[in-house]
Regions:
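An N-terminal hydrophobic leader/cap segment in hydrolases
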Residues: 1-6, 18, 200
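Conserved HGGG/HGGXW glycine-rich cap/lid loop of the alpha/beta-hydrolase fold
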Residues: 13-66
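Short glycine-enriched, charge-decorated loop/helix-capping segments at active-site entrances
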Residues: 69-74
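Conserved acidic catalytic loop of the alpha/beta-hydrolase fold
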Residues: 77-95
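Conserved hydrolase catalytic core segment
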Residues: 92-136
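Flexible "cap/lid" loop of the alpha/beta hydrolase fold
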Residues: 120-162
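Alpha/beta-hydrolase
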Residues: 150-200
Length: 200
């Protein structure tokens, strides 16, 4: 497992990516969800990917984690980054897996580069929804993004700062905010720390 690898793309942007599991295993590009990064697979653990015979390659999307921002980009721009990374790693074919908002990037790869893919999988993909479908905290986020983006940025900085709180305080706050099933997952030993790493 190597959680930080940096690659310079042809347009001089930096792309950060992590690798998990068996380096000789079946190659799978993992596209993280919203609000997380290339560290999201830490939630499952490197040993799980090794056990499954997978080589998981998890890049940060532009402007996330340690990858440089790319102005005016669309979903299809992502496929160029994926192809360059795959070529750099010597991978002719690979699978793609996207979680939540990473699903749109899987769809872009399936549409633009089907000849390079073994398979394309979306897990808990984002859907067309209204704010009424969301948890109250997420509803507020969408409204802030739309009407007061500067205030959303401030709230995200405060949220990020709260992730550095002592674990017992953080768990107490999360217990109030999360559904019981999600909170139960975070109570497992080491899970909270890995979740915080993925979000930072």
């Amino acid at each position: 497992m190597k959680t930080t690898n940096l690659l310079t793309l042809p347009n001089d942007r930096q792309l950060a990516y992590a690798e998990y599991g068996d380096l000789n295993g079946h190659p799978v590009f993992y596209f993280h969800g919203g609000g997380t990064s290339r560290l999201e697979p830490l939630l499952l653990g490197d040993e799980e990917f090794t056990r499954l015979g997978l080589r998981l390659i998890a890049p940060d999307r532009p402007g996330i984690g340690q990858s440089d921002f790319q102005p005016n980009r669309g979903f299809s721009d992502w496929t160029k980054d994926v192809i360059f990374l795959a070529d750099t790693l010597g991978l002719d074919k690979f699978s793609v897996l996207g979680v939540s908002s990473g699903g749109g990037y899987v769809a872009a790869c399936a549409a633009k580069i089907p000849d390079r893919l073994y398979s394309a999988v979306v897990v808990s993909g984002a859907w067309e929804f209204t704010t009424a479908d969301l948890l109250k905290s997420n509803r507020w986020s969408f409204l802030l993004i739309k009407y007061l983006p500067w205030l959303y940025r401030v709230s995200m900085k405060l949220t990020q700062r709260s992730l550095n709180a002592p674990p017992h305080k953080l768990l107490k706050n999360l217990k109030k905010a999360l559904p019981r099933a999600d909170y139960t997952v975070l109570e497992a030993p080491g899970r909270l720390q890995k979740s915080c790493e993925a979000l930072n």
